Amino acid sequence: MLSVAARSGPFAPVLSATSRGVAGALRPLVQATVPATPKPPVLDLKRPFLSRESLSGQAVRRPLVASVGLNVPASVCYSHTDVKVPDFYDYRRLEVLDSTKSSRESSEARKGFSYLVTAVTTVGVAYAAKNAVTQFISSMSASADVLAMAKIEINLSDIPEGKNMAFKWRGKPLFVRHRTQKEIEQEAAVELSQLRDPQHDLDRVKKPEWVILIGICTHLGCVPIANAGDFGGYYCPCHGSHYDVSGRIRLGPAPLNLEVPPYEFTSDDMVVVG
């Protein structure tokens, strides 16, 4: 009856098939089997990522189709239309959104933009690091009041001509000498070839009559004696270094001249050291 209904063409919707079963004493020779209902395909939920490649082998690619014909069993194809494949639209640039267009033409512009962003970020980080290091170093430096105490003001009118006076500056001995005209001419006439540490007398003074030196021997740090030695300047009693009136090493183991500190004349009779 089913085959007749299938072959009846336009009359198939109004035809119906009926059958009756009568219980008998004999058992059938062959047991009737009920065909198993095919299960719809199930997606593998163990896959951690959803992409076009991972879903291409599991989801049905064709739309929902139902086909029927004479002497042909009916078939149904299922299509999962609720699966959203990510396209990364929000993460791509406008130049590469079109998958059918080559991205080679815009590669230089995109690289330039990336380089620009990297350079700006690097400069910003370097500037921030520089400020942090500068503030850290400044926090360890001496404050303004400490620096003010590191300066000493000397009244030159208290030092007679030809004499040397010692002061204490930053924990070091400071020599201030008022030279005579003879001493000025004598030191200016010294040949630089005779000096171990060549330096002209005028390069060590701001006023020829005043010599300001740090009274520490450049050999091992002893304090020299003023108005002593073979050259009438300074003499170190520790190891016998002789300095002239300009503080230049002339004899002995000391390798360098006496150090000249920074100083400035505020008036004819006043000098500030430091």
Curated annotation (Swiss-Prot):
Lineage, uppermost ranks: Eukaryota, Metazoa, Chordata, Craniata, Vertebrata
Domain of life: Eukaryota
Mitochondrial intermembrane-facing ranges: 141-274
Entry-linked PROSITE patterns: RIESKE (PS51296)
Membrane topology (UniProt): Single-pass membrane protein
Enzyme class per UniProt: translocase
Family statement drawn from the similarity comment of this UniProt entry: Belongs to the Rieske iron-sulfur protein family.
UniProt miscellaneous comment: The Rieske protein is a high potential 2Fe-2S protein.
Binding sites annotated in the UniProt record for [2Fe-2S] cluster: C217, H219, C236, H239, S241
Compartments where located: Mitochondrion inner membrane
The reaction(s) this protein catalyses: a quinol + 2 Fe(III)-[cytochrome c](out) = a quinone + 2 Fe(II)-[cytochrome c](out) + 2 H(+)(out)
Disulfide pairings: C222-C238
Mitochondrial matrix side: 79-103
Protein name, as recorded: Cytochrome b-c1 complex subunit Rieske, mitochondrial
Note on cofactor: Binds 1 [2Fe-2S] cluster per subunit. Fe-S cluster delivery to the Rieske protein is mediated by components of the iron sulfur (Fe-S) cluster assembly machinery that reside in the mitochondrial matrix (including HSC20 and LYRM7).
The enzyme's E.C. designation: 7.1.1.8
Residues covered by the Rieske domain: 187-272
Entry keyword annotation includes Cell cycle: no
